Amino acid sequence: MIENLRKRSTIEVEWRKQPVHMDIDLDQVDNPEAYPITVSVETSKDGSDPGLLWQPMHAERDSIVKETIHAKYVLGCDGARSWIRQRLGVSFIGDLTDSTWGVMDIVPKTSFPDIRKVAVIHSSKGTVMSVPREDKLVRFYIQIDAVNPNAASGLARRDLKVEDLLDAARAIMFPYTMEAAECAWWSAYRVGQRVANEFARHDRIFLAGDSVREYCLEVIRCQ
C-alpha cells in the first residue's frame, strides 16, 4: 500500500514520530483553505523509536528532533490508549469487564494444523483467536483470566509477561503444542464495551478504530 502511494501520489508515510502537543486555531476552522491545526512531534536523530506514547521518552533529550506540522485535518487511529483522544479530553462511555485478554504477534512453532488460517479455538480453559499476518507472523488474541484468574486485577496485568500469554495459549490449545520462535509485539488489557462520547472536533479532528471504541472479544463465542 505504501509503495502504491509513492507511485501514484506525493504522499509520504513517516514512522517513529511521537506527538507531544496539539493546538487548533478556532478562528480558522471554518476556512476551507486554512491549516488550523498545529501538531508538534518528536523523533530520535537515528530514527529509532523515541518511546511508547504511554511511557516516558526513553531516548536522550539531546538526540530528539522536534518538528511542527500544520494540518488541515487530523485523523486519530492511534489505538485504545489514543494520545489524540486524551488530548481532546474525549471520554469513553460504557462498562469494563473482569475479562483480561492478551494479544501477541509471534512467529509460532505449533502442531496446530490451521495456523495459517483465521481460527477460533474454544476449550474448557478459554478462547484463543489466531489471525495470520505478514512475514510468518500470526496474531493471537488469548483469554488469560480463564487460565490465570489473578490476571483480572490491574496489578497482575502489569506483572504479566509474554510467557504468561504463551502459557495461557498452550493450556487453551492443548493437546496442540505452542512455542514462539520470535515475538514482534505483545500486550495485555482488560476488555470492555465502550464508545467515545465524541467522534470529531470542529469537523477537523477525527477519531477512528480502537481510539474511539472498545469491544469484548468474547462475542465470538456467539458466532
Swiss-Prot record:
Q: What Pfam families does the record point to?
A: FAD_binding_3
Hey, which pathway is this one from?
Answer: Secondary metabolite biosynthesis
Q: What is the disulfide pattern of this chain? A: none
Keyword check for NAD: no
Question: What is a GO molecular function of this protein?
Answer: FAD binding
Keywords in alphabetical order, please.
FAD, Flavoprotein, Monooxygenase, Oxidoreductase
- Provide the E.C. number(s) assigned to this enzyme: 1.-.-.-
- InterPro entries, per this entry? FAD-bd (IPR002938), FAD/NAD-bd_sf (IPR036188), RIFMO-like (IPR050641)
Extract the coiled-coil ranges from the record: none
Q: What induces it?
A: Expression is down-regulated by ralstonins, lipopeptides produced by the plant pathogenic bacteria Ralstonia solanacearum. Expression is positively regulated by the imizoquins cluster-specific transcription regulator imqK.
Q: Which positions are annotated as binding FAD?
A: R139, F140, Y141, Y189, D210
Specify the domain of life of the species encoding this protein.
Eukaryota
Q: What does the UniProt record say this protein does? A: FAD-dependent monooxygenase; part of the gene cluster that mediates the biosynthesis of imizoquins A to D, tripeptide-derived alkaloids that serve a protective role against oxidative stress that are essential for normal germination. ImqB is a canonical three-module NRPS that assembles the tripeptide backbone of the imizoquins via condensation of Trp, Tyr, and Leu-derived precursors. N-methylation by imqF and phenol oxidation by imqC, followed by cyclization via the FAD-dependent oxidase imqH carry out the three-step transformation of L-tyrosine into tetrahydroisoquinoline.
Protein name as annotated: FAD-dependent monooxygenase imqC
Annotated organism of origin: Aspergillus flavus (strain ATCC 200026 / FGSC A1120 / IAM 13836 / NRRL 3357 / JCM 12722 / SRRC 167)
Classification lineage: Eukaryota, Fungi, Dikarya, Ascomycota, Pezizomycotina
